[in-house]
């Protein structure tokens, strides 16, 4: 276990609540908290047994005045989250009492922790690897049961085990190549280009399977980026309110009411969906509305799914056709809204689009709502998304896998072109290094620091 100073931070969300928790971690955690803790039983906490609690008060270091009534728990390292001695102080919730307890612990000798520093120490002390550490934040940020289950599986080491198996197989290839090259006179089993190529192809298949899972995994982690588009007053904001089951967006008969994008999360069959209501797309001289239209177009560029709304009580015009031409090669659903009114649109103008993705809809009468949800589920909720724990959800992991794949492919080409196994071994080792970046074993320290700085304070 590495030696660090003792850190402290608030681990619960700031705000009024029944309880707040201040976490203290480090070699001196017990002795520091003992300076400001007065137990009801008149006992200090220096001799506390691990996994026990004490009831008492946190007092001012200077004069002994009571700050708050607390319960203190102790977990002795290395059998704690960080691998160090950890003390958690449970005080009354609320910004001021929590802040005062933390201030007094810092006065007693602790340092205010940096964002993610507790989890970083757990990683550096070998309590978890980097992919497991990242899963901690994924659990906190999960939006649905499916996304939480995926994050929990990663925190339990599902991805780590797959990566470690691949790295071990690559390491065995490297060891056999180096033994053959360095000790040709020894009576070793011959390693040929054909043998190595076969092993690498098997490894490539497994890497490809993990890469293929990444698109669905990204949806679980970050949400399905869904953009509602259409001309002004076709019902985009009304659709957002219907999906959220609340009045989140302002709805009026005045075109151009929505001038900026509105983003909210909804849950459809376990799929977290980040749904974006955009400004109506039309030619306008209004400067603010014009900016909103430009943002709408930017959101369309990065969307996983586009929901295009058409007012079916009006004829399809040039602006609609322009959007149809844009979305035809993307993932889309077309809602023919206002079917409760007289239908005037010419459906022949929709021939460029997949008829299975066109839904007759009425926000007002809730016609087509279930079909919309079913269509989204059929498009994105595959068997893997519903049942597979071994899924790549992190873009950083996908990029490392792509690098490993590239190195394996390059080494295979070298074997085919030259049959020289020693030349191929350089790229094979680079593939091993790339995979190690996922678990943190071969990642540079500055990149590790950057990852943990994105964590919340107190975690």
UniProtKB/Swiss-Prot annotation:
InterPro entries cross-referenced by the UniProt entry: G_TrmE, GTP-bd, GTP-bd_TrmE_N, GTPase_MnmE, MnmE_dom2, MnmE_helical, P-loop_NTPase, Small_GTP-bd
Pfam families on file: MMR_HSR1, MnmE_helical, TrmE_N
GO CC term (a single one): cytosol
GO molecular function terms listed in the Swiss-Prot or TrEMBL record: GTP binding; GTPase activity; metal ion binding
Residues involved in Mg(2+) binding: 237, 258
Enzyme Commission code: 3.6.-.-
Gene Ontology BP, a term: tRNA methylation
KW Aminoacyl-tRNA synthetase (keyword) present: no
Enzyme class, UniProt record, top EC level: hydrolase
Family of the protein in this entry: Belongs to the TRAFAC class TrmE-Era-EngA-EngB-Septin-like GTPase superfamily. TrmE GTPase family.
UniProt-annotated binding residues for K(+): 233, 252, 254, 257
Keyword Cytoplasm: yes
Cofactor binding remark: Binds 1 potassium ion per subunit.
Function noted in UniProt: Exhibits a very high intrinsic GTPase hydrolysis rate. Involved in the addition of a carboxymethylaminomethyl (cmnm) group at the wobble position (U34) of certain tRNAs, forming tRNA-cmnm(5)s(2)U34.
Protein name (database record): tRNA modification GTPase MnmE
Record keywords: Cytoplasm, GTP-binding, Hydrolase, Magnesium, Metal-binding, Nucleotide-binding, Potassium, tRNA processing
SUPFAM superfamilies per UniProt: P-loop containing nucleoside triphosphate hydrolases, TrmE connector domain
Binding of (6S)-5-formyl-5,6,7,8-tetrahydrofolate, residues: 23, 88, 127, 459
Assembly with partners or alone: Homodimer. Heterotetramer of two MnmE and two MnmG subunits.
Main location: cytoplasm
Cofactors named for this entry: K(+)
Protein residues bound to GTP: 233-238, 252-258, 277-280
Cell compartment(s), UniProt: Cytoplasm
């Amino acid at each position: 276990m590495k030696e660090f100073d003792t850190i402290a931070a608030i681990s619960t969300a700031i705000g009024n609540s029944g309880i707040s928790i201040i976490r203290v971690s480090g070699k001196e955690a017990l002795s520091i908290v003992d300076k400001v803790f007065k137990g009801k039983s008149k006992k200090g906490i220096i001799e506390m047994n691990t996994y026990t609690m004490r009831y008492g008060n946190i007092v001012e270091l200077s004069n002994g005045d009571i700050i708050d009534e607390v319960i203190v728990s102790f977990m002795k390292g290395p059998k704690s989250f960080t691998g160090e001695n950890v003390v958690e102080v449970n005080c009354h919730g609320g910004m001021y009492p929590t802040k005062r307890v933390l201030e007094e612990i810092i006065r007693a000798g602790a340092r205010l922790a940096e964002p993610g520093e507790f989890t970083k120490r757990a990683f550096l002390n070998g309590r978890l690897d980097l992919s497991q550490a990242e899963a901690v934040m994924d659990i906190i940020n999960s939006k649905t049961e499916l996304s939480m289950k995926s994050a929990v599986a990663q925190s339990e080491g599902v991805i780590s085990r797959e990566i470690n198996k691949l790295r071990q197989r690559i390491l065995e290839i490297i060891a056999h190549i180096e033994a053959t090259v360095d000790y040709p006179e020894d009576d070793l089993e011959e390693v040929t280009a054909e043998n190595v190529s076969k092993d690498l192809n098997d490894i490539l298949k497994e890497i490809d399977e993990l890469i293929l899972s990444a698109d669905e995994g990204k949806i679980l982690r970050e949400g399905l980026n869904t953009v509602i588009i259409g001309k002004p007053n076709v019902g985009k904001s009304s659709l957002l309110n219907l999906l959220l089951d609340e009045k989140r967006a302002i709805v009026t008969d005045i075109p151009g009411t929505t001038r900026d994008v509105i983003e909210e999360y909804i849950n459809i069959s376990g799929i977290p969906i980040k749904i974006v209501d955009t400004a109506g797309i039309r030619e306008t001289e209004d400067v603010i509305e014009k900016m909103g239209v430009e943002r709408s177009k930017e959101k369309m560029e990065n969307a996983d799914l586009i929901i295009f709304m058409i007012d079916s009580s009006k004829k399809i015009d040039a602006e609609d056709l322009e959007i149809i031409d844009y979305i035809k090669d993307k993932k889309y659903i077309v809602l023919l809204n206002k079917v409760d009114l007289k239908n005037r649109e010419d459906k022949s103008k929709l021939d460029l689009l997949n008829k299975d993705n066109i839904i007759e809809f009425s926000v007002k009468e809730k016609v087509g709502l279930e079909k919309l949800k079913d269509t989204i589920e059929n498009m994105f909720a595959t068997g893997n998304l519903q049942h597979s724990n071994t899924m790549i959800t992190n873009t950083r992991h996908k990029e490392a896998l792509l690098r490993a794949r590239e190195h394996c492919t390059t080494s295979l080409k070298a074997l085919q072109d030259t049959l020289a196994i020693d030349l191929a071994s350089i790229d094979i080792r680079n593939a091993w290094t790339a995979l190690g970046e996922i678990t943190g074993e071969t990642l540079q320290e500055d990149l590790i620091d950057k990852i943990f700085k994105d964590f919340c304070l107190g975690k």
